[in-house]
Amino acid sequence: MTTASGYSAQETVERALAAARSDDCVVIAEETSGANLRWAGNTLTTNGVSASRQLTVIAINRHGHGPKDASAGVVSRAGVRPDQIEDVVRQAERAAAEATPAEDADELAGPEQPGSFGSRNKETGEIAGPGQAGSFGMGNKETGGIAGRDQAGSFDLKNRDEPGWDSPPSRTEIGVLRDFAATLGETLRAAQAAGRKLYGFAEHELTSTFLGTSSGVRQRHDQPTGRVELNAKSADLERSAWAGAATRDFTDVDVAGLAAGLAERLDWAKRTISLPAGRYETLLPPTAVSDLLTYLYWSAGAKEAAEGRTVFSKPGGGTRIGERLSAQPVTLSSDPRAPGLACAPFVIAHASGPDSSVFDNGLPLSATSWISEGSLAALISSRHSAEVAGLPVTPAIDNLTFATSAAAPPALEDMIASTGRALLLTCLWYIREVDPQTLLLTGLTRDGVYLVEDGEVVGAVNNFRFNESPVGMLGRLVEVGATVPTLPREWGDYFNRAAMPPVRVEGFNMSSVSQAS
């Protein structure tokens, strides 16, 4: 598909690679489309669509002393026209010429890497399709069947919607919200009749990423990302509650169900109770758990841990890999093929960092347990930082699941019913790091903190500022519920794909009373 800019994303990749004069080159072309809907005071207010295009060129100069002796220059530009492609390549090459040797330098991934869907065959020059050797969708030698998404290294060939390298970039449009909007309209009218006000937004994006390298890799991934956030207020605007959901296509969003849950919380808040700061047994819903554990995940880098700079550093040197963090049999994991949370199954790195590397572009990703049955099992690493830390290579993956292996984990409603006295949170926000050595975080509760006594919610209490370490919290888990898909409220702009349980934490530190509402 040729766009208004003149070339398809695939052609842009090929022309940039053809124009390159550096020893190696990596090109990433991304096309993103979006649709959104907003409402306030029970009235639809705006809707819109968007489209954007991004080109990243990574030029690599080799200095003749092996694959680890190289420098890299990176240039990213939006809306690049055909006549500007070569200029972007030259800018990247100039940046590489001026750069010092990169500490993460390495050889590029080759098309023979397992999982290189869309890789170029060096002998024939053809782009591998989903059923060819070295690609996802591998046939089972014994059964002849096609591997599905839930099997390692596979795309489902029976899903004809899975595009190949040569297929046009996928796009979203306002129609993805059509059925949702119809149900939303009914929900807004019901809220109006009941004397409640609903505010919120729904948005959907679809990004097609095309990755090509001078080593022959050609990989493509389409990533749908959607979310809805809904806020309910009483008619006098004194009571407020929030709910959110992440989605791939809005077919699984029950906006009426979300609104019903908010109505119940507004009713809980008709009675208010003042509580002082202190340590409380606390029920955290999945959204709050995801915000805390997402930050833990982002902080779980191998390089800085090996350097003694983080909570995952071992006193005296090394990392805490193998150390038990929780008495509960909990596992924190990522899997690019997790049902409902699928993400890119290969590394896409626009820049190098402590635990990411532009030299790793195209490396296949596989399911990784960061915490396994309560013990620290892996840290995020590039090939370089894994070598520094003396650990296996485990790059970051764009989803996160936290679950217990205990039998019959309860739903949040059952956890409330079995509670003697505890706080029940709605969500967290304004989360900031205080101390990386303990991963102490501070932040605020928002849109509803409730007191539970003898199995029932008895009223709403004031908001608090909290000071907690998610690592320390793991050691004080009393109960872990059933894992469900959720939306991190604080980090949902950056990290959308999560499945978390509600948890019961002993002594959650509400450090001060907050006047925030």
Which residue stretches match the model-derived regions?
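Active-site bordering "gate/hinge" segments
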Residues: 1-357, 372-373, 456, 493, ...
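Dual-mode signal for accessory low-complexity, basic/Gly-rich regions
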Residues: 317-517
